UniProtKB/Swiss-Prot annotation:
Official protein name in the record: 3-isopropylmalate dehydrogenase
Binding positions for NAD(+) per the UniProt entry: 272-284
Molecular function terms from GO: 3-isopropylmalate dehydrogenase activity; magnesium ion binding; NAD binding
Gene Ontology BP, a term: L-leucine biosynthetic process
Gene of this entry: leuB
SUPFAM superfamilies, A to Z: Isocitrate/Isopropylmalate dehydrogenase-like (SSF53659)
Cofactor note: Binds 1 Mg(2+) or Mn(2+) ion per subunit.
EC numbers for this chain: 1.1.1.85
Pathway the protein takes part in: Amino-acid biosynthesis; L-leucine biosynthesis; L-leucine from 3-methyl-2-oxobutanoate: step 3/4
Amino acid sequence: MKLAVIGGDGIGPEVTAEALKVLNAVRDDIETTDYDLGARRYLKNGELLTDEDLASLREHDAILLGAIGAPGSVPPGILERGLLLKMRFALDHHVNLRPSKLYDGVESPLRNPGKIDFVVVREGTEGAYTGNGGAIRVGTPHEIANETSVNTRYGAERVIRYAFELAQSRRKKLTLVHKTNVLVHGGGLWQRTVDEVAKEYPEVAVDYNHIDAATIYLVTDPSRFDVIVTDNLFGDILTDEAGAVSGGIGLAASGNIDATGTNPSMFEPVHGSAPDIAGQGIADPTAAILSAAMLLRHLGDEDNAVRIETAIAADVAGRDNSQPISTTEVGDRIVKALQS
């Protein structure tokens, strides 16, 4: 396996090191290439993501990312658009995959959360995040700004098909989330596409929630969900709420996936770079290790993905949450569990 590694900023390199430690415990064929991408490189020479970087990344089977960001040093939007979004569009990461699971031993902010185990499949390259818009008369009382949400049948269908395949392998329930009563054009396209693709998956039960209803159900009845499929903007909202109800983004992993396999997909923890605790050895690497398990599953190594997830579940359930996390100790415990 040829693996591109982007440690990034803050705690990113620390948690990525533990994810690699775990990967190497279950596989002996991993060849890694490290990439200096993120705030550090930008502040040093102004570079974000060059054509040469992209060409080199494309030579790998997958990408493992730690965290990107330097709040206070780099203005908002520069790293997001110049690095992360550029990579997403260049590598056609049209599926953003966000599992949400409440592990034993983890406290949810919900009083009676029930069983939380669902996945959000978010479209990643269309919608309101394409940069299609503009502004005139900026800074005047007559300023006008618009953002155009772009939805194509091709873009929606490939993500919807991915979601149906995922639902088929899980509990066989898919929920479309949109706002079809108001966003009649884009929402109508999504609804029609789901209805048509659903005919090919008769075993999958399909329902629909408006985005406002879905945000309520995530708090009042999260166990109703199995696979949620939605567009870019609504997915951005739902995935963070999903992370919150299942114990926080410290345990949240994600995948940015080219489902065709043409380009390497990228896997990363949801948390940020947390520069305030960087270098102290107290960052929780669990989400990064879960991201590594997602990476293996994407590449077809289901057995080792399950082994890692099982070891993580046991480790999380057995933690003394009154004690501080040790980054390296978490990685060591999971490796030991895998080797026992």
